[in-house]
Amino acid sequence: MVVVAILAAGRGTRMKSRLPKVLHSLGGQSLVERVIESVEPLSPSRRIVIVGYQSEEVQTAMHSIPNLEFVEQTVQLGTGHAIQQLLPHLKDYTGDLLILNGDLPLIRSETLKQMLQTHAQNQNAATILTSHLPDPTGYGRVFCNNENIVQQMVEHKDCTAAQRQNQRINAGVYCFRWPDLAKVLPHLQANNAQKEYYLTDAVTQVGQVMAVDVEDNQEILGINDRLQLATAYEILQKRVKEKWMLAGVTLIDPASITIDETVELQPDVIIEPQTHLRGNTVIQTGSHIGPGSLIENSQLAENVTVQYSVVIDSTIQAGSRIGPYAHLRGHVQVGAGCRVGNFVELKNTQLGDRTNAAHLSYIGDTVVGNQVNIGAGTITANYDGVKKHRTKIGDRTKTGANSVLVAPLTLGDDVYIAAGSTVTEDVPNDSLVIARSRQVVKPAWQRKSVENKTTDQHK
């Protein structure tokens, strides 16, 4: 049985931000959410987040995560002081306590499982995660014997010049037998350069403590500033992109592509440069995305093409072509075999199968039938200044260039709208609509106009 405690009370001053450090986003999730996610496969009996700086904001940001407990550290006096706040909440607990910093977003569940197994097999009072770094600057040092039993732990700022030569560092992940730690916590002293209560001071007081090295140093990258945040994002993206390329997805110029972990891709999808896939996006086999496109929270069926376009909260059926320079947003549904072309915006709109909107159009709050052709420059005037109104366009209807459809409006099946028309009334099936001024031609008007102006000037 294990209880998890996540340290999320610090401000993170080096981030230079009003936002608490643990709430900074990495690939669509906050740092602390990623840590919480990493402990889920361990099936902990309780998950406790220790909050402090802007605690209400931190708690609000995680309100949707079920069965999460919060304990407040009103004054931030170090990691040991943070764990002291758990004493009244774990009075009768006799199991293990796994402690992680809330700024370790790349830690893997497998690493934590291995650490817990080592802890149990060796009946340790405590087990800590360590690593060897070529440049350990900024990390606390761990000193062990040949059997990886910890002899001493020293924070970087408290290290002597000789101690700083040690490259074995504390990764900020601990597993304690809680009863042993609970006895030591009240007696911690702030005898250090920071005048803080260090959890590391408790390590050598609880009994046998073993160090376990992490295999991949990238997992223990702590996020203290924007540079480290960017580095973590690069590592995360490398993991994601390698996964999909090995699964049969082609990424052309992977360095210029970003893919959230929540995205699902099928084999034989091709992603061109400068394309960004975000949120709960699913792209099925044979689709070709990019270059220069953003797909967010959208589902694309087989053999869809998207070029230089933005697709958000939309569904696109098989064989449809989007772009270049199209914008789909607000729960758009595009049927099979459609074309949404140059400078077309769709908002909260449904297109039937084999419907085309190829050029320079805005279609909003509209249901469009099958085999409809939206002429260049067609606009749905759906907003009256107070409310947005719906438009319905029947099957096989064709709108001429530069048409304006003033909602609320219903066009039946097989309707033809003449170019330049402004349509304000419902149109029945099989109708032709001409809603524009009659053309008037005045021969020689320009010559007469010039002559009149010349005469006026000589008066």
Swiss-Prot record:
The gene is glmU. Mg(2+) binds at D103, N224. PANTHER family: BIFUNCTIONAL PROTEIN GLMU (PTHR43584:SF3), NUCLEOTIDYL TRANSFERASE (PTHR43584). Its EC number is 2.7.7.23, 2.3.1.157. Pathway: Nucleotide-sugar biosynthesis; UDP-N-acetyl-alpha-D-glucosamine biosynthesis; N-acetyl-alpha-D-glucosamine 1-phosphate from alpha-D-glucosamine 6-phosphate (route II): step 2/2; Nucleotide-sugar biosynthesis; UDP-N-acetyl-alpha-D-glucosamine biosynthesis; UDP-N-acetyl-alpha-D-glucosamine from N-acetyl-alpha-D-glucosamine 1-phosphate: step 1/1; Bacterial outer membrane biogenesis; LPS lipid A biosynthesis. It is found in: Cytoplasm. Its cofactor is Mg(2+). Residues 227-247 are annotated as: Linker. Acetyl-CoA binds at A376, N382, Y383, A419, R436. It comes from the Bacteria. The active site is at H359. Homotrimer. One of its GO terms (cellular component) is carboxysome. This is Bifunctional protein GlmU. Residues 248-459 are annotated as: N-acetyltransferase. Residues 1-226 are annotated as: Pyrophosphorylase. NCBIfam families: glmU (TIGR01173), PRK14360.1 (NF010940). GO terms for biological process: cell morphogenesis; cell wall organization; lipid A biosynthetic process; peptidoglycan biosynthetic process; regulation of cell shape; UDP-N-acetylglucosamine biosynthetic process. It catalyses: alpha-D-glucosamine 1-phosphate + acetyl-CoA = N-acetyl-alpha-D-glucosamine 1-phosphate + CoA + H(+); N-acetyl-alpha-D-glucosamine 1-phosphate + UTP + H(+) = UDP-N-acetyl-alpha-D-glucosamine + diphosphate. Its main location: cytoplasm. One of its GO terms (molecular function) is structural constituent of carboxysome shell. Binds 1 Mg(2+) ion per subunit. Catalyzes the last two sequential reactions in the de novo biosynthetic pathway for UDP-N-acetylglucosamine (UDP-GlcNAc). The C-terminal domain catalyzes the transfer of acetyl group from acetyl coenzyme A to glucosamine-1-phosphate (GlcN-1-P) to produce N-acetylglucosamine-1-phosphate (GlcNAc-1-P), which is converted into UDP-GlcNAc by the transfer of uridine 5-monophosphate (from uridine 5-triphosphate), a reaction catalyzed by the N-terminal domain. InterPro entries: Bifunctional_GlmU (IPR005882), GlmU-like (IPR050065), GlmU_C_LbH (IPR038009), Hexapep (IPR001451), MobA-like_NTP_Trfase (IPR025877), Nucleotide-diphossugar_trans (IPR029044), Trimer_LpxA-like_sf (IPR011004). It comes from Nostoc punctiforme (strain ATCC 29133 / PCC 73102). In the N-terminal section; belongs to the N-acetylglucosamine-1-phosphate uridyltransferase family. In the C-terminal section; belongs to the transferase hexapeptide repeat family.
